[in-house]
Regions:
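An acidic-aromatic substrate-binding cleft motif
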Residues: 126-201
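N-terminal accessory beta-strand-rich subdomains and adjacent acidic, glycine-rich linkers
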Residues: 1-153
Length: 203
């Protein structure tokens, strides 16, 4: 947004960005849970159960839309991954709305109460200002979506790293065994498994 005359700041309360996908599209989406619910009122914590290969018309489990990244199968024509990048402390983290046949999926701002009274559900920005990126990665297979670096390519680094970091494959005990799997013996198993599979990392 450019600066208009003497205007120095503005409040962004929503976005008109929307994504319309072909009718044959099915979804692989993580539903956004209600604010301040769940264990220690930490939701939405982006760890809900994905539903696989669902029609776009299927409402989200909690009526609050979906957490990024959002994966779509375009029938037999390929795949699309919709996400965001470049969100920092002066903008809100967004998600996708439920599907609407007229508008598709739209960018949804945080729910009231999501910040637990700290911060806002809108963005107050100094002008000039650029909003975060909304990205779409397409592929005939999942390979380009898994290997994309778009989240890093379109943003300016916020700091200089002390070493070269490289994307790679990994194993992760917590994903399978949750908190009970975060112990020494299980980590050794996952380190060994990463080595056997030729993976670069263990989380």
């Amino acid at each position: 947004f450019p600066q208009y005359g003497e205007t120095r700041v503005m409040t962004i309360t929503g976005e008109a960005t929307s994504f319309r996908l072909p009718a044959q599209t099915t979804t692989f989406l993580c539903p956004q849970n209600k604010a301040m619910s769940g264990w220690m009122r930490t939701k939405p914590c982006y760890e809900e159960e994905y539903k696989l290969d669902m029609p776009m018309s299927e409402p989200s489990a909690f009526g609050e839309g979906y957490t990024f990244p959002c994966l779509f199968r375009i029938g037999g024509d390929g795949w699309a991954l919709v996400s965001e990048t470049g969100t920092c402390g002066n903008y809100v983290g967004c998600h996708l709305s439920d599907y609407n046949p007229d508008t598709g999926y739209t960018i949804a701002f945080p729910m009231p109460g999501e910040s637990n009274g700290i911060g806002q559900t809108s963005a107050g920005v100094a002008l000039p200002y650029s909003t975060p990126w909304r990205t779409i990665t397409l592929g005939e297979t999942l390979k380009p979506l898994v290997e994309t670096t778009i989240a890093y390519d379109v943003v300016e680094p916020m700091y200089q790293t002390t070493r070269q970091y490289k994307p790679g494959r990994y194993t992760w005990s917590w994903l399978l065994w949750q908190d009970g799997g975060t112990n020494y013996d299980d980590q050794v198993k996952f380190i060994d498994m990463s080595e056997r599979m030729g993976y670069e990392y263990v989380l």
